[in-house]
Amino acid sequence: MGNKIISMMKKDSKDGGGGGSKSKRMNRSQRKLLADEEMLHRRALSMAIHQAQLSQRFDGSMSRRVGSTSTRKRTLSDPFSNGKQVPDFSESLIVKKFVLVHGEGFGAWCWYKMVASLEESGLSPVTVDLTGCGFNMTDTNTVSTLEEYSKPLIDLLENLPEEEKVILVGHSTGGASISYALERFPEKISKAIFVCATMVSDGQRPFDVFSEELGSAERFMKESQFLIYGNGKDKPPTGFMFEKPHMKGLYFNQSPNKDIALAMISMRPVPLGPMMEKVSLTAERYGKGRRFYVQTLDDRALSPDVQEKLVRENSPEGVFKIKGSDHCPFFSKPQSLHKILLEIAQIP
């Protein structure tokens, strides 16, 4: 494994951010927009630093390093809204609660722009930290099954009022968790949205989706330099974590500099067991769920070809595409992702 990753070169060829004359005067709404985004980012960064400090006691592999090689300039298209009045869609929607489920190594913190924009639209976003992720201080080396890993999501769904339904949104390997949840609670889930995610089929492992990029699971377990041996080198590996340069090239090739810095101090090792577990899905439960897929077209972690293969082999109800997005559209294309989430929510 690794030839594709190790040879990965980071692209920073982006448009600058606007000419001088147009930027001389910024109207009041634009200033407020940028100030609001700055405040949100500072809060997220502060929480991430606090998390990193706490996690040192539980997880020795947590990194506190902050940095980025991105030269991307800030533009007015980056913020979570465009300065115009955001329509309130809540009146026309029956299901208003979104449950946002992060992918491998991430935590609830990664959704901060989506939370802000969905709330502005009159909706009710909820985020979860899966077991061993974000502020959930479980040692990732002890998380061995998808059931354990997804427990915070399952607990949330179990505790919903009897008649309440939610829209699930899963990013990357969070797709396996929302698939598992859809199998468990099809009656509680109005729609499931897979954002460049592992929309697995019955009997498939979440890791299998990445096999074209990472090699076969068997080869990865034997040869990968990213494995973590939480129980000792003489025992099977318990997790994995890419090195910082690899993460930047794989996940964040179009993301803003500040969001890369946030991710670099916030991401945690990925428990290996849940990624290698074959997911059991039935036509009677999972198969009755309404699934939608969001493809990211400048994705280096899960290539557009692989995403296209996923939707061919396990067809969802609808497919949406985001041009110019890396593997983290909540950072690189938040407005586009927000628009798609609203569009899917409004589908009868």
From Swiss-Prot:
Gene Ontology CC entries for this record: chloroplast; plasma membrane
Transit peptide region: 1-76
Molecular functions (GO terms): hydrolase activity
Active site, UniProt feature: S172, D299, H327
Pfam families from the UniProt entry: Abhydrolase_6
Coiled coil regions in record: none
Residue(s) carrying Phosphoserine: S77
Record key words, sorted: Chloroplast, Hydrolase, Phosphoprotein, Plastid, Transit peptide
InterPro entries documented for this protein: AB_hydrolase_1, AB_hydrolase_fold, MES/HNL
Signal sequence coordinates: none
Subcellular location(s) of the protein: Plastid, Chloroplast
Origin superkingdom: Eukaryota
Region entry Disordered, spans: 1-29, 60-80
Primary location group: plastid
Role of this protein: Putative methylesterase.
PANTHER family for this protein: METHYLESTERASE 14, CHLOROPLASTIC-RELATED (PTHR10992:SF785), METHYLESTERASE FAMILY MEMBER (PTHR10992)
Family to which the UniProt record says this protein belongs: Belongs to the AB hydrolase superfamily. Methylesterase family.
Protein name: Putative methylesterase 14, chloroplastic
Organism field: Arabidopsis thaliana
